[in-house]
Amino acid sequence: VYSDGSDVFWTREQIQKLIKIFPEGQIVTVVDDKIVGCALSIIVDYDKVKNDHTYAQVTGKETFNTHNPKGNILYGIEVFIHPGYRGLRLARRMYEYRKELCETLNLKAIMFGGRIPNYYKYADQIRPKEYIDKVKQKEIFDPVLTFQLSNDFHVRKVMRNYLPNDEESKHYACLLQCDNIY
């Protein structure tokens, strides 16, 4: 679903494994009997993940062997909404579910690596930190980061090479976090 062709396509086996190891962490959005979006998650032990990691590391190269039911972080590994159904607040509803799940499971926070897909437009002028600050100040619109900031997430760290093929983000991602305050 990304314009740069870096779509992540999930195999039936991967989805089945995620459902088997953590069914409540996998959700779909259905409109008129059609799946139009999904959110996939695992639980990780933050002490093992740390601030600097890649998508491949946190997902065990998409084997999900990093899932730890006794961990303390709900880690989002994917969210997508079919382009024809964007703007209907469906992603926001999935994030509300994740927040409720985090609270129910008494986890410390929700975290994930968030792309900054409009950064390529500014990369020759400003560094990622400045870009993030300008998005926070609403001087720059970034479809991913703007949404996450409006959904109570904060940037914990800028990570390099999180998604090595993400040219739009210039190989950067924001480690985003929403704390469970309950």
What do the PLM-derived regions correspond to, one by one?
Residues 2-48, 53, 57-65:
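Active-site rim helix/loop that mediates acceptor-substrate recognition in acyltransferases
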Residues 16, 99, 144-145:
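Short amphipathic alpha-helical segments and helix-helix/interface helices
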Residues 24, 170-175:
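Short hydrophobic/aromatic beta-strand or adjacent loop that forms the aromatic wall/cage
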Residues 39-78, 96, 116-143, 149, ...:
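Conserved acyl-donor/pantetheine-binding loop and adjacent beta-alpha core of acyl/acetyltransferases
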Residues 81, 87-103, 109-112:
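Conserved acetyl-CoA-binding loop-helix of GNAT-fold acetyltransferases
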Residues 178-180:
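Long, compositionally biased interface segments
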